[in-house]
UniProtKB/Swiss-Prot annotation:
Disulfide bonds join C449-C456. Glycosylated. SUPFAM superfamilies: Thioredoxin-like. This is Thioredoxin domain-containing protein 16. A motif (Mediates endoplasmic reticulum retention) lies at residues 816-819. It comes from Homo sapiens (Human). It comes from the Eukaryota.
Length: 825
């Protein structure tokens, strides 16, 4: 059941497929046999039709095949028309009967032959091809005994999606196959075309297609039958998707808040909510009633148990049911219904189900629940026809991975073709390749873990997307920065040299601190860090080296430990061991003592030192400053900040007046979202520049510096003193809104954090043994294209915004160390 066709898997959005390999024109490629077979790739599926020449009896089929190009490519399946010529020797270009078939290949292995009369339209083509590829995910049965055997085998393990369609190849069959493509590794799909089987499970209206959800995972008693929920809407791809979403939602949820403010996945799907009002004295009976109602309304409405005793809002004393419609702005209804059937009837009589027209083939960009809920997936979908120069990167496979990373220093992008974040980051990765074209000594490569999951597992890839750098003689380095072009480019450029740099003379140290030694890298690291140690400080040097190894790709680090190190320490008033921080943009050098400081503390010190005193806030760097948990003192400017304002604020920073705040400025031209922020603070919007204090972490108050006063030191100090004394009035209070999951059962990040915290903290392990980054595969020369590789079900989506990137770097570094500190030979 859980092995599957893994060209692409869609985890975030189903209806809107986030697929990169989308042609700009939906046309059927025409190739020669030799050319066609040369394009086949291991693990990739391809449908081909061989013909001598167009004839009246094949022209209709070719039209339908042309229509199937786009939907099949959505699933990573290529389609081609192969023109046979007399000189060509091929078993597929031989007899007339061979020319009346289409052939499905996976790699160079023939999987199925389809007579063209069974591929009568685009629905039949898509349905048959997916059916052939999903042979493990979809069980075809003909009798009740087979269904009972599958049901018994999966009790307590997994749920079943059972479908009846009138015939193979019709639109309903295609819809089921498309659902199986997405959910086949989560649920066991069972299909039948036998009316007798449908009748035997008690179905009515057997002339129509049916789809049931068998709730077998909850069944622990093998003698108990699995509950069954019938999908009452027509069998379309979208309806099946929405139905499965409701099956995944919690059956019953307890709430203790205003029903008008409650939102669940049901409302997002256009379904109403039913609140069963409970109180402490009748809680158990009310919960049993609510569960019974929930089973009756499963797939039709969401059911919640509303705890009256915990509510701050008033509910009429006699009301025992609250009904909330899916339409926005409609007030909730307070009802008195003492019979379960009355509750069911009220819901069914008041449901407003909007008909959704599906257009499988036209390139519509209508609203989709998942996509509208996920801006990354939506962006990838809208950019799906953007042609990227993929040839600037090398695509790796199981056969080529080892040889490539051992032959040259390589950057490897591990991604999943079905995942929106991966596909968005792939665009940034290609943009980096464009910038580095012809200048980088690093080989930029990529591997699709949806196709080559074994490789990704061996490389300890446990989340998507992830970048790893492989250098000969060094441990693999994982990139843990922002998933954008500039940050990744900085990471690659700074990794051109090894860290920490070993400085061998006073003159070289001065050149290092001035930026002359590595002036081509100063563009990517405005701060250079030099560790000063006496030759006998072995432990301190080891800790610093470990910290520098952590931070490589993010900051330039060097170490000086010669006999004359006291000359440098005296010059810069630094007591050994110490750090010298050279801020190149400001032309100043600071010293920080390192007495009894461990590697992780050094990482923290350097990370904090990278923060600017008066930074320009951008979308990329906001998390770094937001994590400081201080009120933000923001100067909003419509362009470059006035030098006088900057000087005044920096003076207060140096005089320690602003230690309790995070002073920063925001350029509305560079970061247009700032205008939306100001509109939330002011009505109407006053003229710029504007100095605002935002207390995000405590209370949400927003204070504005008086616009009739000049932004000078004296006025700022007076204003801050008034704020401290409580003499200034806030202009607004930001609502305490959080981006919460729709229901507690969807709070996956807290579950992950809880599991992580239980493991306890560990010190950074040291490398005890060196092993090769790759093991020799004795089966290297076997035909692996026929092997159905399992998708990595445990892979987690990488957090999109890293608020504390050095901690993520630490995790990645630990994982690579725990692999045995493997090195590329």
């Amino acid at each position: 059941m859980f092995s599957g066709f893994n060209v692409f898997r869609v985890g975030i959005s189903f209806v809107i497929m986030c697929i990169f390999y989308m042609p700009t024109v939906n046309s059927l490629p025409e190739l020669s046999p030799q050319k066609y077979f040369s394009t086949l790739q291991p693990g990739k599926a391809s449908l081909a039709y061989f013909c001598q020449a167009d004839s009246p009896r094949t022209s209709v089929f070719l039209e339908e095949l042309n229509e199937a190009v786009r939907p099949l490519q959505d699933y990573g399946i290529s389609v081609a028309k192969v023109n046979c010529v007399k000189e060509e020797i091929s078993r597929y270009c031989g007899k007339e009967k061979d020319l009346m078939k289409a052939y499905l290949f996976k790699g160079n292995i023939l999987l199925r032959e389809f007579p063209t009369d069974t591929l009568f339209d685009v629905n039949a083509i898509v349905a048959h091809v997916l059916f052939a590829l999903l042979f493990s995910e979809v069980k075809y049965i003909t009798n009740l005994e087979d269904l009972q055997n599958i049901e018994n085998a999966l009790k307590g393990k997994a749920n079943i999606i059972f479908s009846y369609v009138r015939a193979i190849g019709i639109p309903e069959h295609r819809a089921v196959m498309e659902a199986a493509f997405v959910y086949g590794t989560t649920y066991q799909f069972v299909l039948t075309t036998e009316i007798a089987l449908l009748e035997s499970i008690g179905s009515e209206d057997v002339e129509y297609a049916h789809l049931y959800f068998f709730h077998c995972k909850l069944v622990l008693d093998l003698t108990q039958q699995c509950r069954r929920t019938l999908m009452e809407q027509p069998l379309t791809t979208l309806n099946i998707h929405l139905f499965i979403k409701t099956m995944k939602a919690p059956l019953l949820t307890e709430v203790a808040e205003d029903p008008q403010q409650v939102s669940t996945v049901h409302l997002q799907l256009g379904l109403p909510l039913v609140f069963i009002v409970s109180q402490q004295a009748t809680y158990e009976a009310d919960r049993r009633t609510a569960e019974w109602v929930a089973w009756r309304l499963l797939g039709k409405a969401g059911v919640l148990l509303l705890l009256r005793d915990s509510l701050e809002v008033n509910i009429p004393q006699d009301a025992n049911v609250v009904f909330k419609r899916a339409e926005e702005g409609v007030p909730v209804e307070f009802l008195v219904l003492h019979d379960v059937d009355l509750i069911i009837s009220h819901v069914e009589n008041n449901m407003h189900i909007e008909e959704i027209q599906e257009d499988e083939d036209n390139d519509m960009e209508g609203p989709d629940i998942d996509v509208q809920d996920d801006e990354v997936a939506e962006t990838v979908f809208r950019d799906r026809k953007r042609k990227l120069p993929l040839e600037l990167t090398v695509e790796l496979t199981e056969e080529t991975f080892n040889a490539t990373v051992m032959a040259s220093d390589s950057i490897v992008l591990f991604y999943a073709g079905w995942q929106a974040v991966s596909m968005a980051f792939l665009q940034s990765y290609i943009d980096v390749a464009v910038k580095l074209k012809g200048t980088s000594t690093m080989l930029l490569t990529r591997i699709n873990c949806a196709d080559w999951s074994d490789v990704c597992t061996k490389q300890n890839v446990t989340e998507f997307p992830i970048i790893k750098m492989y250098k000969k003689g060094e441990n693999p380095v994982s990139y843990a920065g922002m998933l954008g072009t500039e940050d990744l480019l900085k990471f690659i450029q700074l990794n051109r040299i090894s860290y920490p740099v070993n400085i061998t003379s006073i003159q070289e140290a001065e050149e290092y601190l001035s930026g002359e030694l590595y002036k081509d890298l100063i563009l990517y690291s405005s701060v250079s860090v030099l560790g000063l140690f006496s030759p006998t400080m072995k432990t301190a040097k080891e800790d610093f080296s470990e910290a520098g190894n952590y931070l490589k790709g993010y900051v330039i680090t060097g170490i000086y430990s010669e006999e004359d190190v006291l000359l440098l320490s005296t010059k810069y008033a630094a007591s050994l061991p110490a750090l010298l921080l050279a801020r190149h943009t400001e032309g100043k050098i600071e010293s920080i003592p390192l007495a009894s400081t461990h590697a992780q503390d050094i990482v923290q010190i350097i990370t904090d030192a990278l923060l600017e005193m008066f930074p320009e806030i951008t979308v990329e760097n906001l998390p770094s400053y937001f994590r400081l948990q201080k009120p933000l003192l923001i100067l909003f400017s419509d362009g470059t900040v006035n030098p006088q304002y900057k000087k005044a604020i920096l003076t207060l920073v140096k005089q320690k007046y602003l230690d309790s705040f995070t002073p920063c400025w925001l350029n509305l031209k560079n970061t247009p979202v700032g205008r939306g922020i100001l509109r939330a603070y002011f009505d109407p919007l006053p003229p710029l520049p504007l100095l605002v204090l935002v207390n995000l972490h405590s209370g949400g108050q927003v204070f504005a510096f008086p616009s009739d006063q000049a932004i000078i030191e004296e006025n700022l100090v007076l204003w801050l003193k008034k704020l401290e004394a409580g003499l200034e009035n806030h202009i607004t209070i930001l609502p305490a809104q959080e981006w919460k999951p729709p229901l507690p059962a969807y709070d996956f990040l807290s579950m992950i954090d809880a599991a992580t915290s239980q493991r306890g903290t560990r010190k950074v392990p040291k490398c005890m043994k060196e092993t090769d980054v790759q093991e020799n595969d004795k089966e290297q020369h076997e035909d692996k294209s026929a092997v159905r590789k399992e998708p990595i079900e445990t892979l987690r989506i990488k957090h999109w915004n890293r608020s504390n990137w050095f901690k993520e770097a630490e995790k990645s570094f630990r994982r690579d160390k725990e692999l045995g500190c493997s090195k590329v030979n």
